[in-house]
């Protein structure tokens, strides 16, 4: 609501879109996206700034409260300040500056804060895309201010394919493991197969889309455990 209320005060038309039926959406924790639009003069195109508002788990090793937003020496410390509240704040401030200066423009400015980017995007960008929020003539250009740096500006996306694998075993007492069948061993063997057989084949595949930089055209393999899908784990008990 903070994002929507701030932009509404600036004259944006604000819409809250709950991802009904999407993975993770439930009444106790509804998955709600924010889309705010400011209409300029007619006849122009729409530029949309998209940022995700979810974060990965805090992890260990923090010397500050990961959700405290502490400001120290001109820097903000907290989980998600870089990825990607910083990009979201920059988008908001940039659009507000255009409006404050009274710069005339044709078309529209649009800002969205979406959920679920770190765990698949099904309730966030994916949900909105399926409902036409990013298609012409509604939106013509999308800028995603992820924290990559000015030397790593990307154009396009090579796409993604998600898969979920579950291995089964048979329980046994720890003193007699030979009576059981370890699901962990099965998963370990499967991961080894992916890394030795699939990964080399994927590394030779490149998207035909004009994605920039060229290194982002290469297919990669990311293996993680539920509930985290978009972070490389530093440890798991």
Show the residue positions of the predicted features:
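Acidic/His- and Gly-rich active-site-bordering loop/insert found
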Residues: 1-76, 100, 104-105
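Acidic/histidine-rich catalytic neighborhood of metal-dependent amide-processing enzymes
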Residues: 84-162, 213
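Metal-dependent peptidase/peptidase-like ectodomains
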Residues: 141-142, 151-186
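Short alpha-helix boundary/capping segments
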Residues: 13, 76-83, 175-183
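A short, glycine/Asx- and small/polar-enriched loop/turn
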Residues: 27-32, 41-44, 158-161, 214-219, ...
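Predominant activation on well-ordered alpha-helical scaffold segments within soluble catalytic domains
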Residues: 4, 89-96, 126-129, 184-195
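Acidic-enriched catalytic cores of C-N bond-cleaving enzymes acting on peptides and small amides
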Residues: 155, 174-236
């Amino acid at each position: 609501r903070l994002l929507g209320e701030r932009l509404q005060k600036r004259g944006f038309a604000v819409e809250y879109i709950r991802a009904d039926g999407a993975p993770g959406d439930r009444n106790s924790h509804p998955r709600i996206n924010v889309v705010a639009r400011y209409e300029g003069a007619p006849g122009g195109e729409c530029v949309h700034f998209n940022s995700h508002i979810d974060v990965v788990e805090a992890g260990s090793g923090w010397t500050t409260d990961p959700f405290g937003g502490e400001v120290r020496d001109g820097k903000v410390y907290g989980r998600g300040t870089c990825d990607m509240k910083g990009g979201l704040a920059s988008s908001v401030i940039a659009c507000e500056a255009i409006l404050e200066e009274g710069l005339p423009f044709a078309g529209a400015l649009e800002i969205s804060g979406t959920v679920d980017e770190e765990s698949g995007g099904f309730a966030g960008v994916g949900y909105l895309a399926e409902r036409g929020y990013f298609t012409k003539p509604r939106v013509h250009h999308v800028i995603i201010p992820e924290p990559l740096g000015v030397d790593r500006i990307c154009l396009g996306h090579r796409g993604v394919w998600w898969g979920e694998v579950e291995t089964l075993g048979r329980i046994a007492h720890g003193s007699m493991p030979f009576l059981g069948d370890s699901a962990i061993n099965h998963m370990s063997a499967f991961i080894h197969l992916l890394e030795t057989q699939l990964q080399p084949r994927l590394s030779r595949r490149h998207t035909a889309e004009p994605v920039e930089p060229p290194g982002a055209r290469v297919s990669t393999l990311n293996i993680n455990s539920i509930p985290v899908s978009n972070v490389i784990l530093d440890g798991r008990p």
